[in-house]
Amino acid sequence: MGEYGKRAEQLFMEGYNCSQAVLLSYSDITGLDDKTAAMLASGFGGGMGRMREVCGAVSGMFIVLGIVAGYSDPSDAQGKKSTYAAIQELASRFRKENGSIICKELLGLSKPEGTYIPAE
């Protein structure tokens, strides 16, 4: 695990959700202050608001990529294309390493929605 992964793990153990931990660990690259980063990523934890859908760590990676290499001009078709390609590549690499980008699959959970606690 690299420096950013170790930092994200430490932040997660301090109580931040997966998305917050990833985004906060890249603050030197994103330029976001901790409060802004934590608030921005707060709803993505637990696989999107504890719905156990897209993994919060994956969402955090996508936010970092968007800040670093995303597009802002809605008419920038090439920027959109390259951003989406980069997101798809990140997702593919994460799937290969972890088997899925879906929170409940990563955690092996099968409980009904809304019954999870963060420690699970």
Model-found features: residue ranges?
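Polybasic, low-complexity association/targeting segments
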Residues: 1-14
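Short helix-coil transition sites and intra-membrane helix breaks within transmembrane domains
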Residues: 14-16, 51-53
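Amphipathic alpha-helical interface segments
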Residues: 19-28, 64, 75-120
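Acidic-glycine-rich active-site phosphate/pyrophosphate-binding loop
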Residues: 26-43
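Short helix-capping/linker segments at secondary-structure and domain boundaries
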Residues: 29-32, 68-73
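Transmembrane alpha-helix interface/packing and boundary motifs in multi-pass membrane proteins
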Residues: 44-52
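FAD-binding core of FAD-dependent oxidoreductases
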Residues: 52-62
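DPxDG-like acidic metal-binding loop motif
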Residues: 60-70
